[in-house]
Amino acid sequence: MKRVAFVFSSAPHGSAAGREGLDALLATSALTDDIGVFFVGDGVFQLLPEQRPGAVLARDYIATFKLLSLYDIDQCWLCADSARERGLDPATPWVVDVECLAPDALRARLHEFDVILRF
């Protein structure tokens, strides 16, 4: 089976990309066990706790990220530099357990996957 990576690089609630990526991620988990999830660039905002999407009339899909472990999706990485560039501490209590990596280490992990889907 091919190894599939999901890369979240867009901010939540401004577009449907994050929600669609999460839906695709959960659907793919029924087909393969070898899934990696990466949060880079503005995608690090996907994992911030205590978001209030209702204020912009958006659906709260962020809570669904907490279900990843129920789908046996436990390979999750976050770009530490992306977090810092956006004024976030990589040690933030994210909504998902992620391993914070430097860009080079993150890139090396990403190259281990056969298919890369970006949202």
UniProtKB/Swiss-Prot annotation:
GO-annotated cellular components: cytoplasm
Superkingdom, natural source: Bacteria
SUPFAM superfamilies associated with the record: DsrEFH-like (SSF75169)
Predominant cellular place of this UniProt entry's protein: cytoplasm
InterPro entries xref list: DsrEFH-like, Sulphur_relay_DsrE/F-like, Sulphur_relay_TusC, Sulphur_relay_TusC/DsrF
Record's subcellular location: Cytoplasm
Keyword Nucleotide-binding set for record: no
KW tRNA processing (keyword) present: yes
Pfam families reported in the protein's UniProt record: DsrE (PF02635)
GO terms under biological process: tRNA processing
Swiss-Prot/TrEMBL keywords: Cytoplasm, tRNA processing
HAMAP family: Thiourid_synth_C
Role played: Part of a sulfur-relay system required for 2-thiolation of 5-methylaminomethyl-2-thiouridine (mnm(5)s(2)U) at tRNA wobble positions.
Xref: PANTHER family: PROTEIN TUSC (PTHR38780:SF1)
Assembly and oligomerization: Heterohexamer, formed by a dimer of trimers. The hexameric TusBCD complex contains 2 copies each of TusB, TusC and TusD. The TusBCD complex interacts with TusE.
Family indicated by similarity: Belongs to the DsrF/TusC family.
Protein name as annotated: Protein TusC
The organism of origin for this protein: Klebsiella pneumoniae subsp. pneumoniae (strain ATCC 700721 / MGH 78578)
Gene name per UniProt: tusC
